[in-house]
Amino acid sequence: MSTTPMAAPPGADLKPVTSSRGRSSTSDEQKLRSSCESCAQSKLKCSGDKPACARCAKRGLACKYVIAKRGGRKPKGYTSTNDNNPSKRREDSHSPAASQWSSTGHLEQSYPYCDPTISGSASPALIAMSDFYNPMDQNLPDAPTSHSDISMDFDFNDCFSLGFPSSNELSDFCNVGSTDMFSPSLDSSSSSSTGPERQLLCDGFSLTDDAMSDLFPLSPPEPQQQISCTPTDKNPHSYQEACLNGSCSCLVEALSLMKQLVSSPARNGAASPPNIQTIIDRNEATIESVRRMLECSCSQDDGYLLSVMSLIIFRVLGWYATVARQTACDVDSQPSRSPQSSISSAGSGYCLEGADSARMAAQLVLSEIHHVRRIVHQLSLKLKAQGEKERSRPETRMEGLEAMDNEMTLPLSATMYDQLDVDLKKRLRALSWEMIDRLRRY
């Protein structure tokens, strides 16, 4: 009995064809993105031209459109098609991995869409930065195409265009005029008054002078006796070298200056009138010596030295006031003379003659105060630092040699240093006011 083979149904022969056609139709339905990969990474609008957009064509970049991602599940044929596509696997093998990043954060090889003119050291991060700093303006110049040309045209010297103040500006800050530190209420109308204003100036000036006179008797120097106050060594580094060698003599020098300023009474018990030439020369030498002692490192730790230097400045200001007052008294006590007569109250260097001698003496003292103002400013900083060091000292109880050493290094209290600072500035201000008042009256 022969059996006749059954014919295959029509749908069976068409099954693989239908499957292949379905996969091809699925791949044909996949759409590309409207923006190329380069414009998408740069967050810029793409013209969408094929095969290369206007931006990539202008910059010489490889324009590539990737498949658009849709929401939902992926089609069944999408995964199998991608897995069976050898070109896709080969393209994925060139994708940057984590191991391909160098220690500096750059890729060791370029992306496939990079221009071949870019060297291998150029990273996509630099390319993205160049795209970010170049907006979508067709009038701008082309971006650099090599790693060596990728640089920001930024001049760092512009950050320092303001510069630092010159030495002349700093010196102008120190050389502030005497009228700048006083109240503008002192006008010419008050110059003729001899009431409470002048009494207030004299009282403020003589506060410390009375206390100093109890310790050191004030007596003018002898006209014929020239006291040498200039140190034997004028080298400004001598004090610093002596401190480094452990043989600092700043305190001894300060005490010697103080002894010379507090001169002994004149012979025969008669006080001779002060000599302007001698006083000004001696004060200038004293100020120079104090300035060099302030530059020494020992002035930062020695409270005794700062105290003695403060007393020296008090005496210098006192001698300036003495010579100005003495000249004014000589002018007031002289009877009226002819224009040919003159009153000489100066030495060979400063000749103050006639009725204007008091005004000239006040002007001379006022010009010398500028040098004292610089010293007072430097000494004020040292006194404040010493006061802060005293305040920062711990409150713990110390005994024996440790407590004795602490008292030797910080002999005075912080309040004492603050008071010396205040008194120095007050004394300098009072002397300046007095000289300005004399200039307005004469």
Swiss-Prot record:
UniProt record, GO biological process: aflatoxin biosynthetic process
Biological role stated in the UniProt entry: Transcription factor that positively regulates the expression of the gene cluster that mediates the biosynthesis of an emodin derivative that may be involved in black Sigatoka disease of banana.
A cellular-component GO term for this protein: nucleus
Keywords attached to this entry: DNA-binding, Metal-binding, Nucleus, Transcription, Transcription regulation
SMART domains: GAL4 (SM00066)
PROSITE patterns from the UniProt entry: ZN2_CY6_FUNGAL_1, ZN2_CY6_FUNGAL_2
Major localization listed first in the record, in broad terms: nucleus
Listed name of the protein: Transcription factor MYCFIDRAFT_198930
PANTHER family: MONODICTYPHENONE CLUSTER TRANSCRIPTION FACTOR-RELATED, OLEATE-ACTIVATED TRANSCRIPTION FACTOR 1-RELATED
Residues of the DNA-binding region: 36-63
Spans annotated as Disordered: 1-34, 74-107
UniProt-listed Pfam families: AflR (PF08493), Zn_clus (PF00172)
Gene Ontology terms, MF aspect: DNA binding; DNA-binding transcription factor activity, RNA polymerase II-specific; zinc ion binding
Bias type Polar residues, positions: 96-107
Entry's localization field: Nucleus
CDD domains assigned to the protein according to its UniProt record, in alphabetical order: GAL4
